[in-house]
Amino acid sequence: MISVHEAKFEDMALAADIMVTSFRTAFADFVSPETMNACSNPVNCRAMLESIYQERNMYFLMGSNHGFICWQATETGAEIVAIHSLPESWGTGLGHAMLSEALKQIGDCPAYLWAFKENTRARRFYEKHGFHWDGTERVSEFDGALEVRYANEHC
């Protein structure tokens, strides 16, 4: 059974492990080995997530100890900053449960997120959940990869 609950500070160690595993699997085809090594260091990921967790207007949910999602309240809505799950949970409904609960908590306001342009699996997932590419692109700080912005204006 899938459960989604508010994350605690102590969950950031597990979230970092999930992020590293997810990152290494999902982004292997379009991130350089150097960037992969730099961005998938468990100690650095944990420190980053612990820092983000303590920021104002940041919200975290854990999904069945196999995934997490975090978002930030903005002046115009909410930015979903990260959604990661262990590869063995892909396609099980975990991502759907986490994103649905996050959107429920975000409420009646626009939400957006950034996805690697080459990450077709993630883009299909977001489209399935009511997000659409709004035409905005940017160069990511991750290896200069192109990112596209997805919006869900009818939360």
Predicted regions: what they are:
Residues 1-4:
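Extreme N-terminal starter segment of soluble prokaryotic enzymes
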Residues 108-110:
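A general structural motif
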Residues 112-123, 128-129, 134-155:
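C-terminal "cap" of GNAT-fold acetyltransferases
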Residues 6-12, 16-90, 96-105, 139, ...:
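Acetyl-CoA-dependent GNAT
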